[in-house]
Design a protein with these regions (language model features):
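Short, exposed "boundary/linker" segments that immediately precede the start
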Residues: 1-7
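Carbohydrate-interacting regions of secretory-pathway proteins
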Residues: 9-138
Length: 138
């Protein structure tokens, strides 16, 4: 099963639906979702269905891993075990083009909210989170 860390718009999230930018967490070798999407954009560390993470990642299958998401204004970075995997800027023409080519194309203003909620989601496998921290950057 897949697991994701989401950021959700305060205005766009419906009570029955949680749609937002996703840091994809899964075992690329074992989960079928890693084989879907375009050019690896549904693999570990990717911005789900939008931006693929590199093929080679510092992923430890037998222990806890450290995932970090840094958001400063519209600039976002995905880190795994101290290695930056991807970075992107929301609210740009490039961002809007990525969204238009994704499964989120029908969600107005997808991913552009300045604030929202955080969601940890799993689709069926056992997954553990520990030491979850949120720090406001200045």
């Amino acid at each position: 099963a897949t697991t994701e860390i989401y950021t959700l718009s305060l205005h766009d999230a419906l009570p029955i639906s949680a749609i937002g930018c996703e840091f994809q967490i899964l075992d690329d070798d074992k989960h079928p979702d890693a084989k879907l999407g375009v050019k690896g954009n549904r693999k570990l560390g990717s911005l789900y269905d939008l931006i693929p993470a590199p093929e080679k990642k510092p992923f430890n299958k037998k222990d806890f891993n450290t995932a970090t998401i840094i958001v400063q204004d519209n600039h976002v970075e995905h880190w795994l075990n101290g290695v930056k995997l991807i970075e992107y800027t929301r609210n740009t023409d490039m961002w809007n083009a990525l969204v238009a080519y994704s499964k989120y194309k029908n969600w107005p203003n997808f991913g552009n909210s300045a604030e929202g909620n955080i969601l940890l989601q799993d689709h069926g496998d056992e997954v553990w989170f520990k030491n979850v921290k949120i720090k406001e950057l200045k």
